[in-house]
C-alpha cells in the first residue's frame, strides 16, 4: 500500500494561483468523485482546501502521483508544468509527516493555530460522505488528530499566537485612532468572519453589520454581536457607510469591484477605508489596492503580522517534531503490517478449507460406525499432513543452499527457531 500527497500552499504559491484551486466544502464530494474516476485504480482520496492551502491525500496499491497532478492542473485550468513549479509532492512517511505537521499547526501561516484541525476534520467527513475514505487514510487522519492533540496539550506551540482576525484588528488600530469610533462591515458568515467579528466586537466599534448571501445565517451571527444584517445585493449602495470592511466568502469571483469602491470613496469624500480580504480566491478586486485612501490587505499581506512571537516558540516546535516523529514511525509500522493482510487472509481461508474437509471426512467415518478415538486420530493426522505437506515438499526441493534457507524458515515457523540437531552438527563440521 502506498500513500501520496500533493498540494500548494502559502509557502509555495501566490494568492491568485491558490485561488484557482480553492474548493468550498460543498464542492469536495463531487470533486473527489471526479478525481477517483479519473485515476485507473480509484484510490482512497481526501481533499483539504483552506485559504492557505489545497492538498490531496491518496492511498492505493500503486503510487499515482503524476496522474493526480495532471488531474489537479486540469481542474484548476493551468498547465501541469506551472502547477509542478508551485506544488509539492510527498510519498509514504513524508506524506504522513506532512499530514501530522499540518494538523498540529506547524505548517500554518499562524504557527500553532487551531482552526486547521477543524478544517481537516471537515475534509475527512466530506471524503467519507463521498465514499472516498478507506482504512489507510482513516488511520492516517485519526492518527493525525491524535498527534495534534498531544502536540497542543504537551507543548506551548499555540502560546502567544496571533490569528488572522486578531492581526486585522491590530492593523485597523494603526490606521484609526479609536476603533470605538468606526463602523465595521463583515462580508460573509463563515468561521473566519465569526472570528473577525469576535475580535472587533471586543473593541466596541460604533456599529457592526454583516452582509451575507443567506440572511438566516447572517442573522444568526449578527444576533451574537448586536449587528445589522444586509443582503449581498445591498452592499454596493451602502459600502460608503463603513470605515472598515472585512470579507471572506466562498465566492469564486470578486464581489467587491473597483467601481463600487470608487463610488464609495467619492461619497465618503475620500475619508480612508480599511479593507481586509481573507478569501481565496479574492473577494475584492486587486486593483482596489491602487486607490488613494484605501488600505487593502490580503491573507498574504497579514503574514508578517502573525509571525510575532514565532521565534520564541522554536523550543515548542522542536518538542512537537519529536511527537510527530514518533507518530510517523507508528503509522509506517502499521502500514508495513497492512502489506501482510492479504496473505494472512489467504492462510486463514486455506486452513478453514482443510478443517471443513476433515470434518466432512470425520462425519462419514462416524456414520460408518468407526469409534470416536479412531475418527479423532484420523482427523488430527489428516490436518497435520495438510499443514506440513508444503513445508516438507520445499525441504526436499532445490539445491543445498535453498534447502538450508528453507530449513531456517521452517524451524522458525514450526520449531520456534530451534534447528534440528543433525542440521546443526552438519553446519558445525
Swiss-Prot record:
SUPFAM superfamilies: Glutamyl tRNA-reductase catalytic, N-terminal domain, Glutamyl tRNA-reductase dimerization domain, NAD(P)-binding Rossmann-fold domains. InterPro entries: 4pyrrol_synth_GluRdtase, 4pyrrol_synth_GluRdtase_dimer, 4pyrrol_synth_GluRdtase_N, GluRdtase_CS, GluRdtase_dimer_dom_sf, GluRdtase_N_sf, NAD(P)-bd_dom_sf, Shikm_DH/Glu-tRNA_Rdtase. One of its GO terms (molecular function) is glutamyl-tRNA reductase activity. Its EC number is 1.2.1.70. It holds the Pfam family GlutR_dimer. Pathway: Porphyrin-containing compound metabolism; protoporphyrin-IX biosynthesis; 5-aminolevulinate from L-glutamyl-tRNA(Glu): step 1/2. The record marks 98 as: Important for activity. Substrate binds at residues 50-53, 108, 113-115, 119. Gene3D superfamilies: Glutamyl-tRNA reductase, N-terminal domain, NAD(P)-binding Rossmann-like Domain. Coiled coil: none annotated. It comes from the Bacteria. The active site is at residue 51. GO terms for biological process: protoporphyrinogen IX biosynthetic process from glutamate. Belongs to the glutamyl-tRNA reductase family. During catalysis, the active site Cys acts as a nucleophile attacking the alpha-carbonyl group of tRNA-bound glutamate with the formation of a thioester intermediate between enzyme and glutamate, and the concomitant release of tRNA(Glu). The thioester intermediate is finally reduced by direct hydride transfer from NADPH, to form the product GSA. Catalyzes the NADPH-dependent reduction of glutamyl-tRNA(Glu) to glutamate 1-semialdehyde (GSA). This is Glutamyl-tRNA reductase. It comes from Polaromonas naphthalenivorans (strain CJ2).
Amino acid at each position: 500500500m502506498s500513500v501520496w500527497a500533493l498540494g500548494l500552499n502559502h509557502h509555495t504559491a501566490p494568492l491568485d494561483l491558490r485561488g484557482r484551486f480553492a474548493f468550498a466544502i460543498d464542492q469536495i464530494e463531487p470533486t473527489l468523485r471526479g478525481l477517483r474516476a479519473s485515476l485507473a485504480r480509484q484510490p482512497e482520496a481526501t481533499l483539504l482546501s483552506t485559504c492557505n492551502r489545497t492538498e490531496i491525500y491518496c492511498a492505493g496499491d500503486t503510487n499515482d502521483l503524476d496522474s493526480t497532478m495532471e488531474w489537479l492542473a486540469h481542474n484548476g485550468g493551468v498547465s501541469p508544468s506551472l502547477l509542478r513549479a508551485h506544488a509539492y509532492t510527498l510519498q509514504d512517511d513524508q506524506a504522513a509527516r506532512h499530514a501530522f505537521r499540518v494538523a498540529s499547526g506547524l505548517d500554518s501561516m499562524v504557527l500553532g493555530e487551531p482552526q486547521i484541525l477543524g478544517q481537516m476534520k471537515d475534509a475527512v467527513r466530506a471524503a467519507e460522505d463521498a465514499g472516498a475514505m478507506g482504512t489507510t487514510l482513516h488511520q492516517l487522519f485519526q492518527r493525525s488528530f491524535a498527534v495534534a492533540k498531544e502536540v497542543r496539550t504537551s507543548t506551548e506551540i499555540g502560546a502567544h499566537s496571533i490569528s488572522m482576525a486578531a492581526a486585522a484588528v491590530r492593523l485597523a488600530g494603526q490606521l484609526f485612532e479609536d476603533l470605538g469610533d468606526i463602523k465595521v462591515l463583515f462580508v460573509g458568515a463563515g468561521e473566519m468572519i465569526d472570528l473577525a467579528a469576535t475580535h472587533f466586537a471586543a473593541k466596541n466599534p460604533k456599529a457592526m453589520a454583516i452582509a451575507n448571501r443567506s440572511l438566516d445565517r447572517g442573522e444568526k451571527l449578527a444576533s451574537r454581536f448586536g449587528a445589522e444584517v444586509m443582503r449581498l445585493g445591498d452592499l454596493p449602495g451602502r459600502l460608503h457607510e463603513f470605515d472598515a470592511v472585512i470579507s471572506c466568502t466562498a465566492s469564486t469571483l470578486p464581489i467587491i469591484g473597483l467601481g463600487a469602491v470608487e463610488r464609495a470613496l467619492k461619497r465618503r469624500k475620500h475619508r480612508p477605508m480599511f479593507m481586509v480580504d481573507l478569501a481565496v480566491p479574492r473577494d475584492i478586486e486587486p486593483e482596489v489596492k491602487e486607490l488613494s485612501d484605501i488600505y487593502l490587505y490580503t491573507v498574504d499581506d497579514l503574514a508578517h503580522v502573525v509571525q510575532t512571537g514565532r521565534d520564541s516558540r522554536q523550543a515548542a516546535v522542536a518538542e512537537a517534531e519529536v511527537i510527530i516523529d514518533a507518530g510517523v514511525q507508528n503509522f509506517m509500522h502499521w502500514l508495513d503490517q497492512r502489506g501482510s493482510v492479504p496473505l494472512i487472509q489467504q492462510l486463514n481461508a486455506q486452513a478453514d478449507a482443510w478443517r471443513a474437509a476433515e470434518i466432512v471426512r470425520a462425519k462419514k467415518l462416524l456414520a460408518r460406525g468407526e469409534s470416536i478415538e479412531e475418527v479423532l486420530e484420523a482427523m488430527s493426522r489428516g490436518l497435520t499432513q495438510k499443514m506440513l505437506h508444503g513445508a516438507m515438499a520445499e525441504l526436499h526441493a532445490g539445491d543445498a543452499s535453498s534447502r538450508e534457507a528453507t530449513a531456517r524458515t521452517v524451524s522458525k515457523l514450526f520449531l520456534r527457531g530451534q534447528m534440528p540437531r543433525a542440521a546443526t552438527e552438519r553446519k558445525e563440521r
